[in-house]
């Protein structure tokens, strides 16, 4: 009887120790050379899963503001200083785990601009009851938002336009924090998957607008692959626009 009693006590203690503890993790998305990604570009889908089994433990949306421009872009942060505040975009994940687990934090978006979709992920150990709050886990997402379109005029003139921004929606302007002269913007003209021309798109302002033109006389269907490239960071954004050169009547 005495032995049985202590076996029961041990089992109860083991059961208590195995009870899952709810743990909170703040997850955020940050654009390259820019600010946080959130509501202004349609939000970012966040998925928290076990890195070994793929079990999804929580998922939701990163929404909120892009953060304080002065803190993020103008004044160098000192060690330990927060990058975020209560308005900065983030997703507060809640996971129930009963032992330390290696989790994967996966981001997909921005959902307001399908052509700019990116996916990024990072893994981190999480210990039951040990929250990861404040700035939380910040994941950098590459890319720009590039929205391109074309217009075909008489004589085979093709006008190419694009409106571009940082992935967080931050503006590209002539004299602002993200200056148009720092980016290469071009359109690669393709037909049947072959490059036939390359057109430089010049900044026309006031915010994020670029345009260029070319002339194509051969009737057929074409594709303009428009890209914006930052040589300093290696960051790239792309969009595509189809157009047709009609046969002469």
What do the predicted segments below correspond to?
Residues 28-38, 163-178:
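Short amphipathic, basic-aromatic surface patches that mediate peripheral association
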Residues 14-20:
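Sec/Tat signal peptide C-region and signal peptidase I cleavage site
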Residues 67-91, 204-211:
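Aromatic sugar-binding surface patches on proteins
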Residues 38-45, 175-185:
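Short coil-to-beta strand junction motifs in C2/discoidin
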Residues 52-60, 191-200, 235-236:
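Surface-exposed loop/edge segments in extracytoplasmic proteins
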Residues 97-118, 229-238:
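Short acidic/polar inter-strand loop motif in beta-rich domains
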Residues 96-99, 215-220:
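Surface-exposed, short loops/turns at beta-strand junctions within beta-sandwich domains
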Residues 125-170, 248-249:
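Short, compositionally biased P/S/T/A/G/V-rich stretches that sit at domain boundaries
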